[in-house]
Amino acid sequence: MEKLAIVVPCYNEEEVLKIASEALRGVLDDLIHKGKIAEDSFILFVNDGSKDRTWELIEEEHQAHPVQVCGVKLAGNVGHQFALTAGLITAMDLSDVTVSIDADLQDDVAVIEEMIDKFHNGCDIVYGVRKERKTDTFFKRTTAQGFYKVMEMMGVKTVYNHADFRLMSKRAVEQFSKYQETNLFLRGMMPLIGYQTDCVYYDRDRKSVV
């Protein structure tokens, strides 16, 4: 049975971290109970130089749940994309498949099971895609559309309405780790990896877990 690592980049997440940990541990427990992932699957919180109690709370969660929760403490604030990359590279040697998700859990954790199912059916990358942007303001919706159009004009392949909520197989992460980019934009790099891909669709919660 494949070992899953859920990678969660964190910056000043003290208000949501314990709630996120509980929710994600629930996902692990459910998938383990259904026989879809290994019993030693885990959550990897990546502390991106937080200035609040984020790291302290990660340590507390690890002490309370040593098998399911672990953490990586970066030396300073390197930004979301680099923190996520650090988590993926760390998880690469410790797991067979990864799922990345933000700590606020605005992305629907319920579709992680569908991602795992698609992985078992041969997919190396599964994108989490928002069904629509009804909860966004007019400004955010318009600028998002403009962003994707600019990316398309520049020849950058992206999946519309996908951020960084995705599943990656071990070999997909290994291939990604070979890229030597200084200005990381993971959404634009994923299609370059190749391998079989698919999408899962969900409604994004405009509220965080708090």
Predicted feature residues:
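Short beta-strand-to-loop acidic/aromatic patch adjacent to the donor-nucleotide binding site
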Residues: 94-106
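A conserved acidic beta->alpha catalytic loop
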Residues: 44-55, 105-106
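Short beta-strand/loop segment that forms part of the nucleotide-sugar
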Residues: 32-49, 73
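N-proximal low-complexity "stem/linker" segments adjacent to membrane-targeting elements
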Residues: 1-30, 34-38
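Conserved donor nucleotide-binding strand/loop of the catalytic core
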Residues: 41, 55-90, 94
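Hydrophobic helical membrane-anchoring modules
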Residues: 1-3, 187-210
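Donor nucleotide-sugar binding loop of glycosyltransferases
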Residues: 13-16, 50, 108
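Acceptor/aglycone-binding surface of glycosyltransferases and processive sugar-polymer synthases
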Residues: 74-76, 80-90, 97, 109-186, ...
